[in-house]
Amino acid sequence: ESVTDPANLPEKSVALQGYNALEYLLFGTGSDTLAEPGDAFRCGFAHAVAANIHLIAAQLSEEWTQEDGFAAAWTSPGPENDYFRNTEEAISELLSIPSEAFEIIRDQRLQPIVPEEDGKANPKSALFWRSDLTMPFIRANFDALRTYFEVSEMISILPEDQRWLGKSIEFEF
């Protein structure tokens, strides 16, 4: 019963706290009885997971936006900055995010479901397979990367003769 209390959930296994747990509770085995009066435990557990996800999102947002948060650190590199000692470090990190994100999408989202050597696919290895949200989630990952690419204006730091890369990258999205 302790997992139904949002205050206790952060002390539990990570496997019980996030989107995968919530998806299982809402779409996994036994979810067809979720709205029935006898399934208060599952409903309470799902509520606790959703509350925990909300709390984590709020904490991340606060860390990014507070006066001494990560956004401020990123835009104010210098000797006293724990993250970025100079502009080059900040720009290097900015530029590395898309390639690292593409690797994560490939390694953690796509490869688990790609057919093995025997030719058999592994659809139940896909994130959010129970809810049929695998592909919308992957699409959202790419949409977020496209937005990041556009908003960061990273192409503007390239020499003029290399800025054509921006159009090429936009086309790929």
Listing of model-derived features with the role each one plays in the protein:
Residues 1-173:
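Mature extracytoplasmic or organellar-lumen-exposed domains after removal of signal/transit peptides
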